[in-house]
Amino acid sequence: MKKIKVKAYAKINLSLDVLGKREDGYHEISTIMQSIDLADILEFEKSEIVKVFCNDHRVPLGEDNLIVKVINLLKEKYQMEEGVLVKLDKRIPLAAGLAGGSADAAATIVALDKLWNLNMSKEEKKEIALKVGADVPFCLEGGTKLAKGIGEIFEDLKITSMNLLLVKPDIEISTKEIYDKWDRLNFKSHHATVPVVQAIQEGNIYKIAENIKNDLELVTSQKYGIINKIKEELLKKGALGCAMSGSGPTVYGIFDDLEKLRKAYEDLKEVYSFVFFSKTIDKGLELYE
């Protein structure tokens, strides 16, 4: 096998409770992570050198890039001499709260396992994933998961398919900055995860939409009023409920009426540079060989 293509799917958070800061600097959370059908496309090809190409010039391709981090970790762990050429077709917006970088890292773990014949176990993949970032273990599996710890302890959930509209304003958010501000201002959690889990188990889209909340929204919307403006617009246009994903700034709305969703899409794409009509899916990655 010389070449592998992977679709790396984005995620949203249907809830995000921040429960405290750990000694290692990470935050203890309780969150429901959900894969959606927005995806980056990555192509991996055997080579003597390591080189990453991307269609978006804003993506940094140095040692801090998560794809590069995974390549270096795997080369070191398995004493690999050969390299890889990676072509990244970036479709998930940057610094958006949608785990685009984490999805690309997960795709790299799975692709190189096959391309380099590493025969990694599920645990070995997860171990590498955790070294790279807190969302990467989820992106390896995808679907709908209740995640605890720093986001690496999972419980599978089964969700009714939902139609979504994603809107990202023209701002980029630093996750670290948002968590630091959360700590400084001593915010208290909404504890939204339990009611959303119950609604998912009941298969009740209306209850899910009614209960979605994200603690980090308190911080991000305080600095960027546009978050609340987008939420108001989505609700006015027929969303059953809406929330920010991750540390933001992407906001999503859940719709049960496709006509209203299409109309909202047409209206909002005139105002915002990134508006995406999406749906929930049950996987994090898709491989093409």
Curated annotation (Swiss-Prot):
Keywords of the record: ATP-binding, Isoprene biosynthesis, Kinase, Nucleotide-binding, Transferase
GO molecular function term, any single one: 4-(cytidine 5'-diphospho)-2-C-methyl-D-erythritol kinase activity
Residues annotated as catalytic: K11, D135
Catalytic activity field: 4-CDP-2-C-methyl-D-erythritol + ATP = 4-CDP-2-C-methyl-D-erythritol 2-phosphate + ADP + H(+)
Top-tier EC class: transferase
Biological or metabolic pathway of the protein: Isoprenoid biosynthesis; isopentenyl diphosphate biosynthesis via DXP pathway; isopentenyl diphosphate from 1-deoxy-D-xylulose 5-phosphate: step 3/6
Binding site for ATP: P93, L94, A95, A96, G97, L98, A99, G100, G101, S102, A103
GO annotation (BP), single: isopentenyl diphosphate biosynthetic process, methylerythritol 4-phosphate pathway
Keyword Ligase listed: no
PANTHER family the UniProt entry points to: 4-DIPHOSPHOCYTIDYL-2-C-METHYL-D-ERYTHRITOL KINASE, CHLOROPLASTIC
Family: Belongs to the GHMP kinase family. IspE subfamily.
Chain's role: Catalyzes the phosphorylation of the position 2 hydroxy group of 4-diphosphocytidyl-2C-methyl-D-erythritol.
Name of this chain's protein: 4-diphosphocytidyl-2-C-methyl-D-erythritol kinase
Organism encoding this protein: Thermoanaerobacter pseudethanolicus (strain ATCC 33223 / 39E)
